Amino acid sequence: MKYAIVEISGRQFWIETGKYYDFNRIPTELGKEITLNRVLLLNNEGEILIGKPYLESVTVKGKILEHLRGRKTLVYKMRPKKKTRKKQGHRQELTRVLIEEIKTN
C-alpha cells in the first residue's frame, strides 16, 4: 500500500492515491491540478522514506473537485446568574481534493 504524509496549511494528512480529502480553502479554480511539495513521509510498498523535514524527490498530484463549507460549530458563552449570553456559529471553508498520483523522482 502506497501512502504519504503531507503538510498542508499547517496540518498533516495521511493520503492515499484515488481518495479525496477536505483541506482548508485553497484559492484556486475548480478542476485545476495542484502539486503538493511538502511531503514528510512516503511508504512505497514497505520502503519508508522520511524527510528532514521534507522529501525533495516526492511530489503529490491532485485535482480540485469542489469548494464547500464544513459542519456548523456552535460556540455558546454564558455568565451564570446574569443575563449575559452569546451564541455564535462558524462554518469552515473547505476544498475537496482528489489525490491522483504520488510520484517519486
Swiss-Prot record:
Asked if the keyword Ribonucleoprotein belongs to this entry, the reply reads yes
* Sorted UniProt keywords: Chloroplast, Plastid, Ribonucleoprotein, Ribosomal protein, RNA-binding, rRNA-binding
- Give the matching SUPFAM superfamilies: L21p-like (SSF141091)
Q: Does the keyword rRNA-binding apply?
A: yes
* Biological processes, Gene Ontology terms: translation
Give its localization. Plastid, Chloroplast
Q: Name one GO molecular function term.
A: rRNA binding
Cite the InterPro entries for this sequence: bL21-like, bL21-like_sf, Ribosomal_bL21, Ribosomal_bL21_CS
Q: Which domain of life is it from?
A: Eukaryota
For this record, the Gene Ontology CC terms, alphabetical, are: chloroplast; mitochondrial large ribosomal subunit
Listed PROSITE patterns: RIBOSOMAL_L21
Q: Which NCBIfam families match?
A: L21 (TIGR00061)
Q: What family does the entry list?
A: Belongs to the bacterial ribosomal protein bL21 family.
Q: What is the recorded function of this protein according to its Swiss-Prot or TrEMBL entry?
A: This protein binds to 23S rRNA.
**What PANTHER family does this protein map onto?**
50S RIBOSOMAL PROTEIN L21, LARGE RIBOSOMAL SUBUNIT PROTEIN BL21C
Q: How does it assemble?
A: Part of the 50S ribosomal subunit.
Instruction: State the name under which the record lists this protein.
Output: Large ribosomal subunit protein bL21c
